[in-house]
């Protein structure tokens, strides 16, 4: 049986690699290693997106506690983003609905789930400044 911590870290690295490649980042996103020792830190940060990555064998819907964990980590600093995957299921991303439409009330309890590729499209389409800022700061 695989070690769950190793499985989680491997998933975080996969997401960092995929996001870096898909968004055309000059420098690969790096895991926040302190998150293993300090509570209330996300796994990855990209622009205003505070990313928590969860990889589990069974299930269809993410646990409420997972969303609360990333909401707590991003409090007053950024947009909570839960990236999750269950075996034999596609990678999905839960974000606050207001991050798709800024005319909506800012309320992190109102969410939507996207496929990972759709999340990448969302960033490229609505938040290109995050890509530009990241590439500028990484240069």
Regions of interest found by a model, annotated:
Residues 1-139:
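Catalytic phosphate/metal-binding cores of nucleic-acid and nucleotide-processing enzymes, i.e., regions
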């Amino acid at each position: 049986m695989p070690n769950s911590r190793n499985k989680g870290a491997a998933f975080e690295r996969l997401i960092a690699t995929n996001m870096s490649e898909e968004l055309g980042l000059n420098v690969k996103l790096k895991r926040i290693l302190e998150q293993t020792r300090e509570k209330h830190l996300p796994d990855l940060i990209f622009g205003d997106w505070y990313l928590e990555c969860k990889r589990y064998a069974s299930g269809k819907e993410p646990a409420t506690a997972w969303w609360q964990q990333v909401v707590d980590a991003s409090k007053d600093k950024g947009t909570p983003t839960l990236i999750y995957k269950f075996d034999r299921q596609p990678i999905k991303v839960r974000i606050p609905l207001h991050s798709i439409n800024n005319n909506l009330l800012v309320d992190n309890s109102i969410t939507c789930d996207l496929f990972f590729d759709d999340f990448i499209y969302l960033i490229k389409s609505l938040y290109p400044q995050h890509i530009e800022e990241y590439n500028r700061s990484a240069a």
